[in-house]
């Protein structure tokens, strides 16, 4: 099984008023080339897709275009994206039902009730030729306030 792991893209980040869009686009093209060459079974993106929790429309389009290109480069690959501390978990998940049609699983929040965590959302199968060859346990960035019943001492 081959897994490609990446994180901390920070799309939309500027450095002292220097627009980094060109280098971010170059990174996404390079990532797509790697996926094309390596044909991994899964790609895991572990948070901080965006630098700001409310990214500009152009930044969101850059992400969407990149994920579609990556999917086209390796249509059978399972893609897992988790939210990081810079991402808005709810905004990242907003199109998750649509993304699933492209083999992309977005986990922005930990789904829980007062009694339990919904693990089904977090356990993602990696399939190869219609059979399960592994699993990814997708856990987004967790804030202590998400678990008020935990003893913090």
Question: What does each model-found stretch correspond to?
Answer:
Residues 70-79, 113-115:
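Short, charged helix-to-loop "capping" segments that act as catalytic/coupling loops
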Residues 87-153:
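His/Asp/Glu-rich metal-coordinating catalytic cores
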């Amino acid at each position: 099984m081959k897994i490609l792991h990446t994180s901390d893209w920070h799309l939309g980040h500027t450095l002292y008023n220097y627009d980094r869009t060109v280098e971010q686009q170059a990174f996404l093209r390079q990532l797509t080339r790697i996926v094309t060459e390596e044909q991994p079974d899964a790609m895991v993106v572990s948070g901080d897709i965006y630098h700001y929790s409310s990214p500009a429309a152009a930044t969101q389009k850059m992400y969407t275009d990149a994920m579609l290109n990556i999917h086209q480069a390796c249509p059978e690959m399972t893609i897992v994206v988790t939210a990081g501390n810079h991402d808005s978990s709810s905004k990242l998940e907003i199109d998750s039902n649509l993304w699933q049609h492209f083999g992309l699983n977005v986990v922005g929040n930990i789904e829980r009730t007062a009694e339990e965590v919904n693990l089904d959302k977090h356990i993602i199968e990696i399939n190869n030729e219609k059979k399960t060859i592994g699993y990814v346990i997708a856990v987004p960035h967790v804030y202590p306030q998400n678990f008020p019943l935990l003893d913090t001492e």
